[in-house]
Amino acid sequence: MDDVTAARVKAAFRHVNRAMVMLWRLGLGRWVNIWPSGSGRILVIGHTGRRSGLRRWTPLNYASVDGELYCTAGFGATSDWYRNVTAEPRVEVWLPGERWMGVIDEVSDHPERIRLLQAVLVASGFAAPAAGIDPRRLGDEALAAATSSYRLLRIRQVAAAEPLPPHPRPGDRIWWWAAVACGGLFWHARRHQRQHHPQVWQ
């Protein structure tokens, strides 16, 4: 992938990522993961900006292999979230029905890197093919060459040293659905009244 294409793909993923995080906050985390072969298996990590110190949120494709969670930085060392977790590996993790503190370790030199990376790419659904990589068809050597810049990371759950922050969290904006429903009912009631009691609006 050339630099121009990579920049466009990164920009597209940035917009998708924002929408994905909002879906989790709207309580749709389970639905986001309902089609693993298409949209992939997705979790969200909360990480600390290496310069700003602010909390950032990034959805990631992941695979569970031998009881461990693995993800990859497809844009290598240029990924902002990767540079953030390299500087501060402690992260907050959102999974369907779960929320906990964890630590991210880079394991790019793992002896089974290709097997683990292939599992993550298969679990990414359309994302890997969109980047020009078909993990189901490529052999080990071809996959290693195509992903030479990829970083492989492992996420481990740890006991939280401090309480998880109340916001943001999965489902913290689920009340939006009630607001939308109330707005819809109000609009429907006004429309019905205009149709059946037009004199009220004259």
What are the language-model segments listed below?
Residues D2-R14, E98-A178, H196, V200-W201:
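Charged, gly/pro-rich active-site loop segments
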Residues A63-V93:
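A short mixed-secondary-structure module that forms the rim of ligand-binding clefts
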Residues G40-F75:
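Short beta-strand segments
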Residues I45-G46, P89-G97:
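Short conserved beta-strand and strand-loop elements enriched in small hydrophobics
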Residues M1-W35:
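Extreme N-terminal tail/first-helix region
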Residues G183-P198:
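Short hydrophobic alpha-helical membrane-entry/anchor segments
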